Amino acid sequence: MKTHVKKDLDKGWHMLIQEARSIGLGIHDVRQFLESETASRKKNHKKTVRQD
């Protein structure tokens, strides 16, 4: 099961990097964006209302 999840993550990461490169971004830009998204989610976690 773990290897299946890892393969999905690897595939998703690869697709994200390909998409970023197609619009002229590098891996550093993607990593910086992901870190800023994670930080903003942690700050706003209590304010977020789930909509299922």
UniProtKB/Swiss-Prot annotation:
BP terms from Gene Ontology: regulation of DNA-templated transcription
Record-annotated membrane-spanning stretches: none
Q: Does the keyword Disulfide bond apply?
A: no
Phenotype upon knockout is:
Defective in biofilm formation.
Question: Where in the numbering of this chain does the Sin domain appear?
Answer: 1-38
Molecular-function annotations in GO: protein dimerization activity
- Known Pfam families for this protein? SinI
Q: Which UniProt keywords apply?
A: Transcription, Transcription regulation
Q: Which SUPFAM superfamilies match?
A: SinR repressor dimerisation domain-like
Q: Which PROSITE patterns does UniProt cross-reference here?
A: SIN (PS51500)
Q: What does this protein do?
A: Required specifically for induction of eps and yqxM operons by antagonizing SinR. Regulates SlrR activity. Controls the initiation of biofilm formation.
Q: How does it assemble?
A: Component of the SlrR/SlrA complex.
Q: What is the name of the protein in this document?
A: Transcriptional regulator SlrA
Species name? Bacillus subtilis (strain 168)
* Record gene name: slrA
